[in-house]
Amino acid sequence: MQEKTKEPEIRFAGFTGAWEQRKIGDYLTLSKIPGYTGVDAKKLTVKLWGKGVVEKTDIYGGSQNTQYYVRRAGQFMYGKLDFLHAAFGIVPKSLDRFESTLDSPAFDLHEIDGAFLQNRVTQQNFYLKFGNIANGSRKAKRIHEVTFLDMPIVVPSYAEQKKIGAFLNKLDSLLTLHQRKLEMLKNVKQAFLEKMFV
């Protein structure tokens, strides 16, 4: 992104004009649908480094006193304590109606593409810059919803967001596929190494 013009250096055909600076809160609404307590909730968590939202599988059941909140497929989530470690994700369909505490808030999206948002906030020039500004020099960096929603974001039209999000998702799928192939080849090589030498 060229800072002065707010236009990216590379664009898809048919899209022109400057991107607009807005606040994240212009596009997200906090969701607080009460769920179960810690003992009964089907839990999910947000992985670090933009790896998404996954089922929480730890043995600890949680406290009867801890309130959980229902999360819906397509919502955006982040980890308050792990903001500076890019704990961001979109709730997948497979985890619809799973729950988290308020330490991992969820938001409904309006006129912003989830894949576009996810890819933007996982860039270091977003989460480090705004995460550090938000909390100064405190050791425990907890980014509250109000602070997050007030952060600026530069966005194109919704149509361009969708195009960018779909393109980046396709690249992620290719990376995953090739990573699996690489792991398989490593395993094949290891098997040969074990059997080809005395």
Predicted regions and their residues:
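Feature detects amphipathic, helix-rich regulatory segments
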Residues: 1-198
